[in-house]
Amino acid sequence: MASFRLFLLCLAGLVFVSEAGSVGAGEPKCPLMVKVLDAVRGSPAANVGVKVFKKAADETWEPFASGKTSESGELHGLTTEDKFVEGLYKVELDTKSYWKSLGISPFHEFAEVVFTANDSGPRHYTIAALLSPYSYSTTALVSSPKA
């Protein structure tokens, strides 16, 4: 159990370090970023399908954004500051397709993270996931936007 906690601490550190790096010269940070790591291979998880939903007034989940992780396991540019308003969001990772592409039969169909965003004013969110075929762990880094 202690090694698992240490691993989660290392994952949080990795997210912090990736968040500290610049996305591009002069580019503003995106308000929502996803980072996915493969715990089996010890590497970024590339080409993981990501869907983001926003909870509507009628309690249904409406599609908000989508994409695939890059070779670095990251997905930037999902939304803009103007569109990423206060609300309940769900990030869904297509873990089944990822593991199947590697010839592995996974337990989970997908991994999801549901969170409230921007309820205390504008924030930037990095959602990080650590995947294995039979488990997943998530963490988040929430920071104030930089001017």
Curated annotation (Swiss-Prot):
* Residues with the Phosphoserine modification: S72
Chief subcellular location equals secreted
Q: Which UniProt keywords apply?
A: Gamma-carboxyglutamic acid, Glycoprotein, Hormone, Phosphoprotein, Secreted, Signal, Sulfation, Thyroid hormone, Transport
Any one of the GO CC terms: extracellular space
Single GO BP term: negative regulation of glomerular filtration
| Modification after translation, per record | Sulfonation of the reactive cysteine Cys-30 enhances the stability of the native conformation of TTR, avoiding misassembly of the protein leading to amyloid formation.
Could you confirm whether the keyword Calcium appears in this record? no
Residues binding L-thyroxine are K35, E74, S137
Q: Which residues carry this modification: 4-carboxyglutamate?
A: E62
Q: Coiled coil located at which positions?
A: none
Carbohydrate attachment sites?
A: N118
- Write out the similarity annotation: Belongs to the transthyretin family.
PANTHER family linked = TRANSTHYRETIN (PTHR10395:SF12), URICASE AND TRANSTHYRETIN-RELATED (PTHR10395)
Reported function = Thyroid hormone-binding protein. Probably transports thyroxine from the bloodstream to the brain.
This chain belongs to the protein called Transthyretin
Taxonomic source organism: Bos taurus
Record lineage: Eukaryota, Metazoa, Chordata, Craniata, Vertebrata
